[in-house]
Amino acid sequence: MALSSPSGGVRRARQLLHVSVLAQSASPCGRFLAAANDFGEIAIFGLSAALSAEAKEENRRAVAVVRAHNGPVYSLASTERLLLSGSDGEIRAWSWAELGRKGCRELWTRRPPCRSSLEVPEINGLEVNQRHELRGHQDLVHVVALREQLPQVLSGGEDGTVRLWDLRTGAQVQLIEVHKYQECSRPQLGKWIRCLATESDWMVCGGGPALTLWHLRSGTPTTVFGLAQPQHHALFHQDLVLSGGVGPALHLLQLSGDVRGKVPVTPAALRSLCLHPRSPEHQVLTVAGNSPKIDVFTNLGYRAFSLSFT
């Protein structure tokens, strides 16, 4: 007897068992959240509706899901009009005004230059400031971060370095070989840099090396955070560093190195943290990773509810 193929609903249910949400980006108005997964999809959530006191379960599901790329969507970034998505060897632009409508298509596709037909880069990080092609890393670049109020960008990669670039000239102006500093080196985990954030003269980065706070002007580590597991994403928030990585926890870290809190989350590992400063209702943080659920925090001490990537 021939076996019939599973229906679309069954196939989707199986797919959701293996979904990882790799990237998030808030809409310019603060009312929506875009989240991207490893099956090439971008989901749009009505964040304002989900935060409403009258919210129902359906308000916490995606209002639209767009098949954006053939491969995983590794990164998202927003402008005042556009949502940019990065996948294997390509960047696509989408109109925020059209994303929730049926039949939405990308506005354009760009393919960064490659040195050979065999080199198809993963677009792991996006920042909206296209001026130069910056070359210097010896391996994959995992993350980039623009410095506020300065024409500079930081990049971290598989080669264990963080590099500071001048966007006026495209020149590298500083090199920090993170894995060579004994304070934060963890050779048993590797030298790769996966997370990177900057604020004023400070930087926090980690991955194989321990998550560490650095003073950029002097190029020296000042605080090594005592987290045993590799961290995948970190950001500054008020007087804290927020981070997530291997393990189902959001870490709240004081700049002194003390752990202010370790908050349980739904994903088995975190890959993306997203602050929503323009959210009209609350100060909101969303966290995502190895799960179809995206946890929403309106208070850093506990999860308020979860959005569902279905």
Segments and roles (model prediction):
Residues 2-17, 49-70, 98-142, 171-195, ...:
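Inter-blade linker and blade-boundary elements of WD-repeat/beta-propeller domains
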Residues 155-215:
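Aromatic-anchored, glycine/proline-accented short structural segments
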